[in-house]
Amino acid sequence: MPITRNLLLALSRSTRLRDLMIHFGPARTIARRFVAGETLNEAITAVQALSQQDLLASLDHLGESVTSETEARDATAETLELLDAIQTGGVRSGVSVKLTQLGLDLSPALAAENLERIVARSAEIGRFVRIDMESFAYVQPTLDLFEALWERYKNVGVVIQAYLYRSADDVARLIRLGASVRLVKGAYNEPPDVAYPLKADTDANYIRLAEQLFSPEGRASGVFPAIATHDTRLIDWARDHTRRQGIPPDRFEFQMLYGIRPTLQRQLTAAGYRVRIYTPYGPQWYPYLMRRLGERPANLFFLLRSFFRR
């Protein structure tokens, strides 16, 4: 990984820098490129605009690593309110959640309780919940909670990160369950004993994992793959592979991040593919912004120029 990205991922955990950035105008300007707003109303408006372009969405109230049960329950209540707004507004969106935001660091039982409240409410209104994957320490707890919930609910899916060595085994397990799987490259700073350090190796593993998900075994079990990438080469591979395998466009979807490559998003929908946009919102945008800056250094240079010109 480039040094710049490693540094930004480390800084994403700095509370002092967070407090500075959330009040720094240029940082807020850049954040609005990647975040649909700070309020629920702004988020719903953004998703309505996506719907007009035939784009689906997965809304996420930003936040992670809460430190109290009260914070975890407040985050759960916010997501339940979000679901009500989705139903009332009739927007084409599910929700994404992070288990550390629901209290996983405090107690797996607390996170499981809060997650089930969200999934149960989503099932009532016919919506889907995606459990985001966080850093390596949370992979197994996340999969454990997902599997426990999968026994009772089918409107829930999970995320697999291609840069982790263990992901092939995890995908095999999820195929046996017939789960919905979002496949991403991975955005956390992981050591080389658990993750591929080179982008080329991650990309190669991404294709291997996608082949697993698109395999006859995967199709037979009911797996629904979500190919989550902005990498044109991987998108072209997925289009070619599914065409050659006779997999119709309604048996998988592409997923991208809000504000990134909107022209490509529209091109894919025009070609008949399902495209879902991960759409984050809320005042806790700082860690998310730092991860996006790590992926796009040009935005970092703009931010630094603005800071030193104050």
Residue ranges of model-derived segments:
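Positively charged, amphipathic and often flexible ligand-engagement surfaces
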Residues: M1-R310
